[in-house]
């Protein structure tokens, strides 16, 4: 369980995340959806201990985000927007390298499991820098699973991929659902709708709506999720304009 209370991140005069309040259930695949600059990646970076919040409190599996950050790092992992692979190592070398860093017991079994899950057999001997975008993303996520994290952060996992590669990666992410808690950021509406148990819509640093895709469609009174998202964002922008 992740409990977030008034989480805020400020960069000088810019409020990147503004008093975020949210609970994410154990085993849930939760998506943060928003346009560029909405605060999704900043939120992920705070929750994964990469940057400190300006204020607020976060409880992750009964651990305090700031006070217990070293313990939290043992139970989480992240696949960032920029693929986290060693470009001059082969796919297999990348997996063994990260297994060594995390001191994974029975690492051969874990590596075989990940190779099978992500269908990496045919590219094992290729250097990471020669891989297609789809395979680079697969390898990056495989690496983030090497330590069996209880919580996995996927920051824009299909960013820049063609539609075939994107759908292929969705199938893998679907297989992970329920086995670990997943927090995914995306600006692809179809991705959030297809994969998520629940979706949080962010705009200008704030969480402005929360629910399943069906609940959000119902709240917005639209025919589909894309129209619901657009309406929710536009109404929030108009509300902020009127306040100003």
Predicted regions located by residue number:
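Catalytic Walker B motif of ABC-type/P-loop ATPase nucleotide-binding domains
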Residues: 152-156
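Conserved ABC ATPase "signature" region
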Residues: 77, 96, 100-123
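ABC ATPase "signature
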Residues: 210-211
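Conserved ABC ATPase signature
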Residues: 88, 127-134
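Conserved ABC transporter NBD signature motif
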Residues: 56-67, 71-72
């Amino acid at each position: 369980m992740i409990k977030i209370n008034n989480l805020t991140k400020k960069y000088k005069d810019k409020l990147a995340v503004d008093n975020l309040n949210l609970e994410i259930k154990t085993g849930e695949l939760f998506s943060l959806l928003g346009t560029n600059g909405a605060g999704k990646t900043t939120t992920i970076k705070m929750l994964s201990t990469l940057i400190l919040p300006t204020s607020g409190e976060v409880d992750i599996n009964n651990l305090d985000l700031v006070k217990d950050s070293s313990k939290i790092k043992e139970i989480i992992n992240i696949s960032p927007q920029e693929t986290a692979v060693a470009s001059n190592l082969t796919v297999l070398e990348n997996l063994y390298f990260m297994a060594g860093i995390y001191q994974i017991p029975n690492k051969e079994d874990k590596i075989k499991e990940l190779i099978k899950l992500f269908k990496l057999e045919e590219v094992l001997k290729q250097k990471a820098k020669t891989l297609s975008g789809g395979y680079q993303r697969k390898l990056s996520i495989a690496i983030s699973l090497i330590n069996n994290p209880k919580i996995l952060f996927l920051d824009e996992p299909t960013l820049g991929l063609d539609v075939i590669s994107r759908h292929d990666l969705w199938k893998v992410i679907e297989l992970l659902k329920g086995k670990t808690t997943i927090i995914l950021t995306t600006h692809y509406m179809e991705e959030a709708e297809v994969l998520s148990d629940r979706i949080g819509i962010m705009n200008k640093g704030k969480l402005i709506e929360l629910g399943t895709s069906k609940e959000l469609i119902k709240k917005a009174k639209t025919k589909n999720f894309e129209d619901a998202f657009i309406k929710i964002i536009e109404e929030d922008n108009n509300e902020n304009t009127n306040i100003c």
